[in-house]
Amino acid sequence: MMYHIPGVLSPKDVARFREQLEQAEWVDGRVTTGAQGAQVKNNQQVDTRSALYAALQNEVLNAVNQHALFFAAALPHTLSTPLFNRYQNNETYGFHVDGAVRSHPQNGWMRTDLSATLFLSDPQSYDGGELVVNDTFGQHRVKLPAGDLVLYPSSSLHCVTPVTRGVRVASFMWIQSMIRDDKKRAMLFDLDNNIQSLKSRYGESEEILSLLNLYHNLLREWSEI
């Protein structure tokens, strides 16, 4: 399943990020890519050795960790260190698949269950640059407002189309979920959403408490932590 997570960053935060990223040191994006991805990748990334990068990636982590919808959809166990990329002048990233595991500075290794892209450019400010994701439901083309995030299974083939006008800047990361299976995670997300909707409409009740108990028992049964 693919999820649109709106408002991870406020417009004020996005503007500040963009201003700081204009001063960043950018390097060839292939430095963080395996052999397969390097053949089709043509973009730039913020140098991870810079002090600015360290500050910005911490802000992204704080923002997603405080976003209730992100937590409900991803049920995160481990988040990768966020990275930042830039596309301009027909730069693109052809179809590829993300690696199944990645190194992690604290945990050693993490499994990539979900991929996330946090858009930092106004979609009207550039042409092209759509994130295209192929999954069992077909092909999806994603180009979200600045500050919004998209979550999708890391097992999906995906690409970024050429940016033919303007500049596309984004942050991206991977998530190891407490729930490895996409279908089980999607069922828990739907159950959680319906519980919250019923609670807001009717208030607390024995039936809602029973559903909440079911949610947590399923999470207890399926989670890997």
Swiss-Prot record:
Q: Report the cofactor remark.
A: Binds 1 Fe(2+) ion per subunit.
Coiled coil listed as a keyword = no
A single GO molecular function, which one?
A: iron ion binding
Residue pairs linked by disulfide bridges in the UniProt entry: none
Q: Which residues bind Fe cation?
A: 96, 98, 158
Provide the species name: Escherichia coli O17:K52:H18 (strain UMN026 / ExPEC)
Write out the entry's keywords from A to Z. Dioxygenase, Iron, Metal-binding, Oxidoreductase, Vitamin C
Q: What is its EC number?
A: 1.14.11.-
- Protein name per Swiss-Prot or TrEMBL: PKHD-type hydroxylase YbiX
Fe2OG dioxygenase domain location? 78-177
One Gene Ontology BP term is:
DNA damage response
HAMAP family found in the cross-reference section = Hydroxyl_YbiX
